[in-house]
Amino acid sequence: MRGIRWTTTAFLLLTAAPGLAQSANQSAASAADDAFGTSVGNERVGLYNPDSARGFSPVTAGNLRLDGLYIDRPPDFSQRLISGSNIRVGLTAQGFPFAAPTGIADFALRRAGSDPALNATLEVGPYTARRFALDGQTPLTSSISLGAGLDYGREDQPNGTKDYYYTFTIAPVWRPRDGIEVMPFYSRYYWKGWSGQPLYFVAGDFLPPRIRRHENPRQSWAGEVGVAPTFGIHSRASLGPWLLQAGLFKSGFEIEGSAVELFQNVDRDGMGDRQIIELGHRRTWSVSGEMRVSRQFDEGKRRHTLMLNLRGRDRQRRYGGGVTLAFGRVPVDQKGPIPEPDFDLGPPSHDHIRQANVGAGYDLKWLGVGQLSLGIQKVSYRKQAERPGVQLPTSRSNPWLVNAAINVEASKSLVFYGSYSTGLEESPVAPAVASNSGFAPPAILTKQYDAGLRYVISPNVRLVAGVYQIEKPYYGLNASQLFTNLGTIRNRGIELSLTGTIAPGLNIVVGTVLMDATLSGEAVEQGLVGKRPVGSSRRTSFANIEYQLPGAAGVTAVVGYGGRGRTIANRMNSSTIDPANSFSLGARYRFDLGGKPTSIFARVANLTDEYSYQMSGEGLYYSPGRRFIMTLTSDL
């Protein structure tokens, strides 16, 4: 591994030259067309992200795209491979063939251009964290360019845990002629010492007492070691009226040493039963991909597109065998070192999923009138599960999935839209505290309705307003800590987004979601769970305001806000977390250093040091406190 790392670094240093695509002059706020979730590099703005959209997770649901093509992604993408992402919901999802409920997380690959270039990033914070990254590209021939990146850093988690990581990516691009591109890539992400925050489970209808933040690090022996490679090939060919797109990917991770620390039966005085769960060796590998053939037919102002699509995945997973050890009743705010115990791990469990989707679609774009999209898919889903000493029956599902979307241009500035879609999605995996920890339920059938409008207030300002309803089977913890089906969840919401330049030098990304999440079914009727899911909130809001200061060339003030309403804190809905509001304040300075574009972005997150709790299953953990981050980015 050491040889690859230094070879990549040498390549980057030798190709220093102007003009890298991910430059010092870009920001997520300036790139955002709406407030539903946009990232550029390590900056992110918007209401949603790949792990949370409309009350669900696109990652968990399997609704990920790599430049428009399906990928089944168990690990995180390296930022050296990905230049950014967008969350596609409502009107923006209509441009994606075979759109799925929950929303789509579409990741953009870093593509090497035809000019030599090098970009460097140095980041300090939060706390004692440090990060250094390089991204470079150079032409090898008239039709082949090579891109590569390296990232090394030390993270400092909100609980005080320190961990280290590095990533690297190699990604050549072949463009034999206009309209044809083939991009193989290899990316590897390695980390050591990471551990999640401690979880607190209270003994009644109250929250834990205030716990000192950043002073609860993991045990010295408890940090996990993991590696997550992602590699494959992405290609497209535009041949007159024909468009061919294909991608084949392999991704996965292997993790050792995961230890989850939690405190059960926490009382009002801050005493709790201390436990550590060693999860054992975990491994997930998936081969996935998509192939699509499209044919366009132009008819005056109308463009018809017919599509045939094949999508599939083969995922194998090893998990389970973990063990829980108890360390007595202790003050939850006075963690002391524990000698490393001898964990007697049990035998693991295995899952194997095979899925194939065959689909056909039709898209009509009518200039000045609107757009119509229709799609149908036949799915073949098989899941084999093996528990210690038990071979479970194979789970099978062969549904037909449909999607239909329409938008109508009422005027040049006003568009109305509506859609309906069904999907076969993965449900969340059982958390570490479940009696069946790591268990992944069979895929679930989901459906979604949405409608709304987009109004272009001015050439630079856009308003989007919409409503949606999503229904899915709901899995959660029952009274005996078994992760099981507890009924049906229905999320209904109103989304609002306002983005653009509202005055000279003043750019905004503002959005809010008002959501009504409800549960129904036998468990609710019998009083085993409440009518609202754990962790749900009726309001989520976001704002990012950037103002270029007059008289201060290159200086932009940045103000951020993130907030949520009251949050359901337990299964019976008898406890809640108060509304939380977090503000950030920063400044970005753009200038030339030796004739090269450079920027410094300094900001303070959680400016008022707001203290709140968040949910992980039915466990609670505290939000990060006030912290400072400074990022220096320069084209070299």
Residues of each region from the PLM?
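Surface-exposed extracellular loop regions of Gram-negative outer-membrane beta-barrel proteins
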Residues: 192-194, 198-203, 314-323, 382, ...
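Transmembrane beta-barrel wall of Gram-negative outer-membrane proteins
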Residues: 117, 123-154, 159-197, 221-242, ...
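Face-selective signature of the C-terminal outer-membrane beta-barrel domain
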Residues: 226-254, 273-387, 409
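Gram-negative outer-membrane beta-barrel transporters
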Residues: 367-371, 469-471, 485-570
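Acidic/polar loop-and-plug regions of large Gram-negative outer-membrane beta-barrel proteins
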Residues: 173-175, 179-236, 252, 256-284, ...
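Repeated loop/turn-to-beta-strand initiation elements of outer-membrane beta-barrel proteins
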Residues: 143-146, 178-182, 241-244, 299-303, ...
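Conserved C-terminal beta-signal and adjacent last beta-strands/turns
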Residues: 21, 534-636
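A beta-strand signature from Gram-negative outer-membrane beta-barrel systems
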Residues: 34, 55, 61, 65-67, ...
